[in-house]
Amino acid sequence: MGKSLSQWDDSIFSNFVVRYGFDLSEKVESYSIGMKTLFLLGLCICSQADLLILDEPTQHLDPTVRLEVMSLLKEYVDGERSAIVSSHEIFELEEYATHLAIIKEGRIIYTDSIDEAKEKHRIIEKGESLQEGEVVGLVVQNVLVKTNSDVGRYPKLNEIVVAYLTGKSERRLALK
């Protein structure tokens, strides 16, 4: 299989197989769900493609392997390559991603670099007055606002995502 891909890297594949103990005499379908995920991710990395599109790439992996995989992906994209990762693991993405797009009902509702997103938003207490800016949505008992004012505190990535996803239906409740 690897021979048909022009940028395939046999040495990376061999190291991956040894590192994670894959038995290549077994059919992939006999692997556990986590091992299948890991194997498929290994194939993607070994392809040396300029762009990887990954859906939940760390799903079903134990925490230590998950950390290693995210480190591998970060190393992979440090050069000229890119990865688009769809994930519900927001805490994980905050450590490795540079940009985000929040998708709700099939539509992108917010996109930015992660650093800019954090810079442009603040978390304030519910009921706190807002002189300038826009209420985005509720985050538990707090409110995410998009503002240039030095109010509240900077948000975590998961707070930005939650506020945009709960968004419009919750805005009217946010400042009550």
Task: Report the location of each language-model feature.
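ABC-family P-loop ATPase nucleotide-binding domains
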Residues: 1-39
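Catalytic Walker B motif of ABC-type/P-loop ATPase nucleotide-binding domains
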Residues: 52-56
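Helix N-cap at the start of a conserved alpha-helix in ABC-type nucleotide-binding domains
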Residues: 63-65
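H-loop (His-switch) motif in ABC-type P-loop NTPases
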Residues: 86-88
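A short, surface-exposed alpha-helical micro-motif characterized by mixed small hydrophobic
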Residues: 93-95
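C-terminal coupling/interaction segments
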Residues: 135-176
